[in-house]
Amino acid sequence: MAVLFTIHSDLRYEIVRKVFEGGMGIIYEAEQHGARNFVKRVAIKVIRQSYANQKQFIENFIGEAKLVADLIHTNIVQTYHLGEAKGIYYIAMELIRGVNLEQFADQLRDKQRVLPPELAVFIASRVCRGLAYAHAKLDKDGKPLGIVHRDVSFKNIMIAFEGDVKLMDFGIAKAKGFLIDNEGEVVAGKADYMSPEQANFQITDRRSDIFSVGVVLANLLLGRNIFKGLNAEESRKNVMTLPLPDFRKLDPRIDDRLNEILHRTLARDLAKRYPDADEVLHDLEHYIYHSGYGPTNETLGKMIRELFGLNTKLAAADAKGSTRLLERAARSTQTLKAKDAAGAASSTRVTRSIKVRPK
């Protein structure tokens, strides 16, 4: 496409606070400033200093930004810009004023609340909407990109205070021509959310993400991850070998149809698993809307604001008010004891793993 003209602009970001610090990167809340006092709140993601000089991490970071830049969907966190400052690459992204599913689940547990099955299914259906879009994405020549997220998990699913469900972090996704891919040689992902083919050093396709959606849905319904072991290696083995339960016996709220959906998403035999996210989405939405009315973003948003003790009017306030909401939510989710948090980390993560296939 011919270029009509070029606009040169110096973007300026002012970092407001640290939102999250993970093993590989840090996410900040920032203000993007423009002409005539224009201000937009964004999230800024940077590589941790200890990894900033490692070529593979840098290339994957850049690849993630390029890949997600054109994934514009209401259920995927949007990427605005890839930049470099003083030799450090950063990604400017949509700022989600809300919590991830891990924080959400912790708060449910703390408040001794149970998530209604219909809302659990609603959340999973929105994740499937985002995945269906990503899986179907084509390159500029009209050829499938073959995107597989490979890290669908509680920490990578956000719920905004308004009730929007957002899939984030394509940092270990695979796609043709975008990211360094040594699949089959290393295990990448969270051990108790990855698919059996991931856990077994096999090549994955979009059905791998469907298995992970099944883990997310089961976790939301039961309040626990059935594959979680004492450590990452045990979790990985559970994903490959643990017999699937009759979910109806674990929770009487799970009926025959929902039990069937869970077993089909979690099928180890790829021929028996759902072939694509669209088909999962169809069954999930039929489950919650077959009677004519079911959960909405507003339903979920109301629950999450009540759960975190957030004033509805404040949730719709200006940027500063929304920042206070984030801070209050963060404080209310700091309920795990240090030893529990450490145990959770050790038992779930082969995250962005460098676990090499045995020779």
Predicted regions and their residues:
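Activation-segment/catalytic-loop signature of the eukaryotic protein kinase fold
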Residues: 82
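C-terminal lobe helix-coil module of Hanks-type protein kinase domains
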Residues: 192-336, 356
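AlphaC helix of the eukaryotic protein kinase fold
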Residues: 48-70
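Conserved short submotifs of the Hanks-type protein kinase catalytic core
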Residues: 86-100, 104
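Protein kinase glycine-rich loop
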Residues: 16-23, 27
